[in-house]
């Protein structure tokens, strides 16, 4: 219980929406707890420190999934010692130090891999507890901050990844990945489908086109899925691509087994009401799907965290990887044509899912902050070659 004024500083990043969603889930949960003595502030560190360079990096990151996969693969799988010699480790350092001096937080929470925090914990005098919410299912070196007080991870396998690289097991808690509470709230699936002019007796295949960043080939996929899965109907989420929504609506406007949508705030309802989802394996999306126990097909996952997430879900029996659209269509047909495998996948997800991650994490944060001491003055130094990047 927080009985005196305390402050949590959340460091996040806007490379994709997932980290921001996790941050918002935690902030909302803490606000719902009505703690008069607790204040929570959040900062997109890299964007605030280097707005122009970070914007360029974000565009490269998004395009890397389509055009620069090998380059991103090289970055993701590079050896830890290379990161230690890279300027990226010092990216945003001065901004972070200024934040700590100004805000004087009692606890720092990372919801984005932030290597610069390692500089503070290793090279500076800092006695502020540092906690990390990891938003993927397999460990990457950028998530590790030496001398951290706590890591919140998705599964027992993720915890073992940390232990294998020498992290103290007592600092790693298996909580699941925090998502919005609505994904754990029951809904009337049948009524939702009826309200959207779909047949509740058919198997609903959910496709998230916006997740792939491409706008071609989905018309053929929809047509082939319906041709090879006799009792299926397709819901296509086009995201912000108005061109894709327009073209698919024109093609399937008279087909009662196809519903074309643009951007939607109702992914929760669609996940809950569908039997299968074709998507990319972003950490938050698949955690939301996991909470709704909807088996997933991962179409051509990019090397890096996407592929690692997909491999983990396939290994656990929660999803399948398809390297091509044709392979995805075959998997859909196999799972929807009276195959018990789909039922078994749903049952496995029901047994293995971890509920109420957000609440569990927030309660532990309060326990940590209740034992934190008053932050002291921060001092330290960085290598000369890195000083250009520490703004």
UniProtKB/Swiss-Prot annotation:
Extract the SUPFAM superfamilies matched here: UDP-Glycosyltransferase/glycogen phosphorylase (SSF53756)
State the compartments where it is located: Cell membrane
Catalyses which reaction(s): a 1,2-diacyl-3-O-(beta-D-glucopyranosyl)-sn-glycerol + UDP-alpha-D-glucose = a 1,2-diacyl-3-O-(beta-D-Glc-(1->6)-beta-D-Glc)-sn-glycerol + UDP + H(+); a 1,2-diacyl-sn-glycerol + UDP-alpha-D-glucose = a 1,2-diacyl-3-O-(beta-D-glucopyranosyl)-sn-glycerol + UDP + H(+)
Query: What keywords tag this UniProt record?
Result: Carbohydrate metabolism, Cell membrane, Glycosyltransferase, Lipid biosynthesis, Lipid metabolism, Membrane, Transferase
In which pathway does this enzyme or protein participate?
Answer: Glycolipid metabolism; diglucosyl-diacylglycerol biosynthesis
Give the GO cellular component terms, alphabetically: plasma membrane
4Fe-4S in keyword set: no
Its domain of life reads Bacteria
Which EC numbers characterise this protein's activity in its record?
2.4.1.315
The answer to whether UniProt assigns keyword Transcription to this entry is no
A biological process term (GO) from this entry: lipoteichoic acid biosynthetic process
Q: Which EC class is the enzyme in?
A: transferase
- Gene Ontology MF term list: 1,2-diacylglycerol 3-glucosyltransferase activity
Q: What functional role does this protein have?
A: Processive glucosyltransferase involved in the biosynthesis of both the bilayer- and non-bilayer-forming membrane glucolipids. Is able to successively transfer two glucosyl residues to diacylglycerol (DAG), thereby catalyzing the formation of beta-monoglucosyl-DAG (3-O-(beta-D-glucopyranosyl)-1,2-diacyl-sn-glycerol) and beta-diglucosyl-DAG (3-O-(beta-D-glucopyranosyl-beta-(1->6)-D-glucopyranosyl)-1,2-diacyl-sn-glycerol). Beta-diglucosyl-DAG is the predominant glycolipid found in Bacillales and is also used as a membrane anchor for lipoteichoic acid (LTA).
Task: Name the PANTHER family for this protein.
Answer: MONOGALACTOSYLDIACYLGLYCEROL SYNTHASE (PTHR43025), MONOGALACTOSYLDIACYLGLYCEROL SYNTHASE 1, CHLOROPLASTIC (PTHR43025:SF3)
Q: Which family does it belong to?
A: Belongs to the glycosyltransferase 28 family. UgtP subfamily.
Protein name, please?
Processive diacylglycerol beta-glucosyltransferase
Organism whose genome encodes this protein: Staphylococcus aureus (strain MRSA252)
């Amino acid at each position: 219980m927080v009985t005196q004024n305390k402050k949590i500083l959340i460091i996040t990043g806007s490379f994709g929406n997932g980290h921001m969603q996790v941050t918002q889930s935690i902030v909302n949960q803490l606000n719902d707890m009505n703690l008069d003595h607790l204040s929570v502030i959040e900062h997109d560190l890299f964007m605030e420190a280097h707005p122009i360079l970070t914007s360029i990096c974000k565009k490269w990151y998004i395009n890397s999934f389509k055009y620069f996969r090998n380059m991103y693969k090289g970055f993701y799988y590079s050896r830890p010692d290379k990161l230690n010699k890279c300027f990226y480790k010092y990216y945003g350092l001065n901004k972070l130090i200024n934040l700590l001096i100004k805000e004087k937080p009692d606890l720092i929470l990372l919801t984005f891999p932030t290597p610069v925090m390692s500089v503070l914990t290793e090279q500076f005098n800092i006695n502020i507890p540092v906690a990390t919410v990891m938003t993927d299912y397999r460990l990457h070196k950028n998530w590790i901050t030496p001398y951290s007080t706590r890591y919140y991870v998705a599964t027992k396998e993720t915890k073992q990844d940390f232990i294998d690289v020498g992290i103290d097991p007592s600092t790693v808690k298996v909580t699941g990945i925090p998502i919005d509470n609505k994904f754990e709230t029951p809904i009337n699936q049948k009524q939702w489908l009826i309200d959207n002019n779909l047949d509740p007796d058919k198997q609903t295949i959910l496709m998230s086109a916006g997740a792939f960043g491409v706008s071609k080939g989905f018309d053929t996929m929809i047509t082939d899925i319906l041709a090879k899965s006799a009792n299926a109907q397709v819901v296509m989420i086009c995201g912000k691509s108005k061109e894709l929504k327009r073209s698919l609506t024109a093609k399937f406007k008279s087909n009662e087994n196809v519903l074309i949508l643009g951007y939607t705030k109702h992914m929760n309802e669609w996940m809950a009401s569908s039997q299968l989802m074709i998507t990319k394996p972003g950490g938050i999306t698949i955690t939301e799907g996991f909470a709704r126990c909807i088996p997933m097909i991962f179409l051509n996952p990019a090397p890096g965290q996407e592929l690692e997430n997909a491999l983990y879900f396939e290994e656990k029996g929660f999803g399948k990887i398809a390297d091509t659209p044709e392979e995805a269509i075959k998997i859909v047909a196999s799972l929807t044509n009276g195959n018990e495998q789909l039922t078994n996948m749903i049952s496995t997800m029901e047994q293995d899912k971890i509920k109420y991650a957000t609440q569990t994490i927030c309660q532990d944060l309060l326990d940590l902050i209740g034992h934190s001491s008053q932050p002291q003055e921060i001092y330290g130094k960085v290598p000369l070659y890195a000083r250009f990047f520490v703004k």
